[in-house]
């Protein structure tokens, strides 16, 4: 994994992986990942999935992993790779006419808001979070 992502994007130390456990799990069931992987591109995601498949290791994906009520970024099978898409945080396109934004999965509400303001957009953004939550994660959670 380090060859595919760089050592700084493969977390294996317990302190570095603390955000990827479920703090509300029953005692002894922390749902600890085997490693946290932080890809920064589609190609890196593909490489991670290829390697995980070759080794039969389950992958648990999250965009920000902040939804603590649902276990956050914690995998349901201990030892799984926690695949965090946080580094994929670019706003790729904003279509003013159709009121649409194309974003990578790690884009937070803060990121989209800042992009709209910096670009001079006239679009107004309704934010269902304090700002650090995931645009994509929130949309998927609510069936958009």
Place the predicted regions along the sequence by residue:
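Extended, alpha-helix-rich binding/interface surfaces that flank or overlap catalytic cores
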Residues: 106
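Short active-site loop/helix that positions an aromatic residue
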Residues: 111-118
């Amino acid at each position: 994994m380090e060859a595919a992502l760089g050592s700084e994007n493969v977390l294996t130390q317990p302190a570095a992986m603390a955000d990827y456990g479920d703090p509300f799990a029953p005692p002894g069931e922390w749902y600890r990942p085997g490693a946290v992987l932080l890809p920064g591109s589609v190609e890196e995601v593909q490489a991670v999935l290829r390697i995980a498949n070759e080794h039969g290791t389950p992958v648990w994906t999250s965009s920000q992993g902040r939804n603590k009520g649902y276990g956050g970024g914690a995998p349901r099978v201990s030892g799984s790779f926690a695949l965090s898409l946080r580094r994929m945080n670019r706003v790729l396109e904003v279509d003013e006419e159709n009121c649409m934004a194309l974003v990578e999965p790690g884009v937070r509400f803060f990121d989209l808001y800042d992009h709209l303001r910096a670009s001079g957009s006239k679009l107004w953004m309704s934010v269902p979070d304090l700002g650090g939550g995931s645009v994509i994660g929130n949309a998927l959670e609510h069936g958009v």
